[in-house]
């Protein structure tokens, strides 16, 4: 029996599969760009596969969702440092809108939350989130399993669920676990920057290895960590927004007890570590810094402090001076509400994509 010749598909038939004939080409280019940047997008998270390094076999998951401090920009940078320079697999999850673009003003979503199922440590830059049950259940499971928590800036007030929510106990996650809740802007917001000053009593703590010069253009938060916390850095309030500015000199009242003190005597803590013991007996290692805008992470030693915090939280030897070089030029956006870049997908924030 003679086989009928195969007729070439008509243009109309091809258009059923590819309405835009160039679309496969552009999809290929997009995939190639992600591969070249060392990232891949999977189920809404951006994942950086591990290169050689001591972190090989460990997965660090970054959770972003703050309206002001451009966590969507700095978390991928930190994640790529850990994967490229230290051998950790890292994933970054974002707050996204209905169209899948990154939108930190949406406080109910966490793209790629499945990454939490294999997390060995969790880095958070969150502010008053009310995640959906699926994402919250994954976070709850990882936290209750004792996964370490590295908390940045507004993560002192990470969650804000209504009283009717089964997750409302997480509204105290800042005070109970991170080590402080939201209290106040101790320095004048957007007017007085922060210089990190090492706490002499813990100057030899491994998280401070190689850390000598921390500066951030965010202000100092008022904070009173619990007695079991080891304070690593205090925040000197500066007179202006430049690293060369002198310390501020004036008095103000503390929000907690209305007692007046010099703004820098004593200085407020801006970084600490602690062990949080759950009622189940499980213990989480916790590293917290109330610094942490994208612009703050222009400071090499602040990046090093956080990388060291990841090592310490996982019980690993902290390098003498961790490599925290960024991929290409890191030009973070200035912090502020409604300042997030519009129309970008999670993969667009991977360093090296040029977005």
Residue ranges of each PLM-predicted region?
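An acidic, glycine-rich "communication" segment
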Residues: 56-57, 152-251, 322-355
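Bacterial N-terminal signal peptides that target proteins for export
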Residues: 8-28
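A short beta-strand-loop structural module common to alpha/beta enzyme folds
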Residues: 88-101
